From Swiss-Prot:
Positions in coiled-coil regions: none
Keywords: Aminotransferase, Cytoplasm, Glutamine amidotransferase, Nodulation, Repeat, Transferase
Pfam families: GATase_6, SIS
Lineage, highest ranks first: Bacteria, Pseudomonadati, Pseudomonadota, Alphaproteobacteria, Hyphomicrobiales
Official protein name in the record: Glutamine--fructose-6-phosphate aminotransferase [isomerizing]
Gene field: nodM
Sequence ranges assigned to domain SIS in this UniProt record: 284-423, 456-598
Domain of life of the native organism: Bacteria
HAMAP family, per database record: GlmS
Biological process according to GO: carbohydrate metabolic process; fructose 6-phosphate metabolic process; protein N-linked glycosylation; UDP-N-acetylglucosamine metabolic process
GO molecular function terms attached to this record: carbohydrate derivative binding; glutamine-fructose-6-phosphate transaminase (isomerizing) activity
Length: 608
């Protein structure tokens, strides 16, 4: 969601602040701002809309302070206006914030009774006035923050800049990530290592409840109880080159085309390629023979990866599997058996609802595995076992390469579970591993259909509604295709299991409705053809994604048939996801949409 950066520099920090905010744009935002210390005075610059609007403000009279904080805001409390943009400040302190202060109304009422004047609709401004109230009573900045933090309910990451203190930043986090970067004579705060990538690769991640007092020479971290704690400092592994578009127009295009490479890299991490067997890089603390049920929780695209994995765990390992949207998991009061397995999936490893689901599952005594793209994330740190995807930083808000790598990891884990439970022979395991090893090559081949899809996208761009249909493992992929299209092109789209067509969605079909059918030639292909015939009979325009056998057997008029390489049916979603992603991307481009930063969306959703 919101992005935070703070810098104590050796020279003017404004350019570094703006550059770091630029790297945080991928998180999603609708306003931006920064504050620097100019002599003893805090100076703020804020702007509604894109970062370029803030840069325009800074162009003619840039601040020269050597200490500052910056922020990209994704509106939660109050409209996306300049007055609601961060930093929020009093005369004595400025603050930037990611998260939600749940008790801000009662705190605001108390502060207003004591004479505080508010200029915004936000929950964050309460934090500035609360800290300021302690400063006015003679507290030091450190003591004022320490006194304020226990009074805040909710999830937050905070960075504070203080009047007349050009060698002091204070950061705090609870339920939202915050990282400290260490440079030569400089120190940094950031929402993640990507924000700090060109400045430093030496990073310390604060843990839940931590707060830190930073100077250019010292970094003291306190736990929630106020005692000094030690946190591990490590190399971030995030290169500035990895957050560059290279020669691509958009990050999403770059990330789609990186998928053969990152899929191969992820597979190499989890397979013994020479022996054609699964070789996890860690020992799982349980035996799959003792697991009676798997619970998978995730949000958005990651949840569709979970739905596809459900087919694999149940078919291959004969292991019952539930899939829940993370925001609902805690509330449906499902009977969970101690000793069973919960798998949580999150690209960022910071998704608030998924983190809450993880904690709920742990509280019920389940073993926990996280599938995350950031192995230093909160979800990773709190999981019993971590299976990282090796997708590299994903900047585009619409997930592509992380989704494919999530499927890779889950597919490998399903094979491991099946083998451990005696449902696969060594020959069976070897065959499935061979199929997985082929996937990067098949993804590369699938990318060759891009010119066809680019032409098709110009037609889809004029549609008001698009339907996606699929059966088996293609049904969740239909849901993912619809999500991709709607989130970046803003065209209304829905995905359905093809068998559900006649139970409602068929009412939408007419000559103006494109219907994307994902149908590899498999055991349910003939049934999917029947659904296509129902669409054709009502004038719907069919776009069929299949293989050569499917194309020859369909015998249905289509607007376009996209032919993918033939492959064994087990892992088709890993390849059939490619044209689905490309169609969403090129349709969004054709409509002139902001592909990498679609409106109202955030890459890392760190509030519930």
């Amino acid at each position: 969601m919101c992005g935070i950066v703070g810098i104590l520099g050796r020279g003017p920090v404004v350019d570094k602040l703006v550059a770091s905010l630029r790297r945080l744009e991928y998180r999603g935002y609708d306003s931006a701002g920064l504050a620097t210390l100019e002599g003893v005075r805090i100076e703020r610059r804020r702007a509604e809309g894109k970062l370029r609007n803030l840069e325009e403000q800074l162009r003619y009279c840039p601040p020269s302070g050597h200490a500052g904080i910056g922020h990209t805001r994704w509106a939660t409390h109050g409209k996306p206006t300049e007055s609601n943009a961060h930093p929020h400040a009093t005369e004595n302190v400025a603050v930037v914030h990611n998260g939600i202060i749940e008790n801000f109304r009662e705190l605001r009422a108390e502060l207003e009774r004591n004479g505080a004047g508010f200029n915004s609709e936000t929950d964050t401004e309460v934090v500035a006035h609360l800290v300021d109230s302690y400063l006015k009573n003679g507290y030091s900045p450190q003591d004022a923050v320490q006194a304020s933090l226990p009074r805040l309910r909710g999830a937050f990451a905070l960075a504070f800049l203080f009047k007349a203190n050009d060698d002091l930043l204070i950061g705090a986090c609870k339920g939202s990530p915050l990282a400290i970067g260490h440079g030569r004579g400089e120190v940094y705060l950031g929402s993640d290592a990507i924000a700090l990538a060109p400045l430093t690769d030496t990073v310390t991640y604060l843990e839940d409840g931590d707060w830190a007092v930073l100077t250019r020479a010292t970094c003291v971290i306190y736990g929630a109880d106020g005692s000094i704690v030690q946190r591990e400092t490590s190399k971030s592994g995030v290169s500035a080159l990895l957050v560059d578009k290279a020669n691509y127009r958009h990050f999403m295009a770059k990330e789609i085309h990186e998928q053969p490479t990152v899929a191969g890299k992820t597979l190499a991490h989890y397979l013994d390629v020479a022996a054609k067997r699964v070789a996890l890089p860690l020992a799982l603390p349980f035996d799959f023979n003792c697991i009676q049920r798997i619970s998978i929780t995730a949000c958005g695209t990651a949840s569709y990866a979970g739905h596809i994995a459900k087919y694999w765990f149940e078919r291959l390992a004969r292991l019952p599997c539930d899939v829940d949207v993370a925001s609902e998991f805690r509330y449906r009061e499902a009977p969970l058996r101690r000793g069973d397995l919960a798998i949580v999936i999150s690209q960022s490893g910071e998704t608030a609802d998924t983190l809450a689901a993880l904690r709920y599952a742990k509280g019920k005594g389940l073993h926990t595995i996280s599938v995350v793209n950031v192995p230093t994330s909160t979800i990773a740190r709190e999981s019993e076992s971590v299976l990282p995807t090796l997708a590299g930083p994903e900047i585009g808000v619409a997930s592509t390469k992380a989704f494919i790598c999530q499927l890779m990891v889950l597919g490998v884990l399903a094979v491991r579970a099946a083998k451990e439970r005696g449902k696969l022979s060594e020959i069976d395991e070897s065959q499935l591993v061979r199929e997985l090893i082929e996937v990067p090559r098949l993804i590369a081949a699938a990318l060759l259909v891009e010119p066809q899809i680019e032409k098709l996208a110009r037609y889809i761009a004029g549609a008001r509604t698009v339907l996606y249909l699929g059966r088996g493992t293609s049904a969740p992929l239909a849901l993912e295709g619809a999500l991709k299209l709607k989130e970046i092109s803003y065209i209304h789209s829905e995905g359905y299991a093809a068998g559900e067509l006649k139970h409602g969605p068929i009412a939408l079909i007419d000559e103006a409705v494109p219907v994307v059918v994902i149908a590899p030639y498999d055991e349910v292909f003939e049934k999917t053809v029947s659904n296509m015939q129902e669409v054709a009979a009502r004038g719907g325009k069919i776009i069929l994604i299949t293989d050569a056998k499917g194309a020859s057997e369909a015998m249905v008029d289509t607007l376009l048939t996209i032919v993918l390489p033939a492959m064994v049916a087990s892992f088709t979603p890993l390849v059939y996801a490619i044209p689905v992603q490309l169609l969403a991307y090129h349709t969004a481009v054709a409509r002139g949409a902001d592909v990498d930063q679609p409106r109202n969306l955030a890459k890392s959703v760190t509030v519930e």
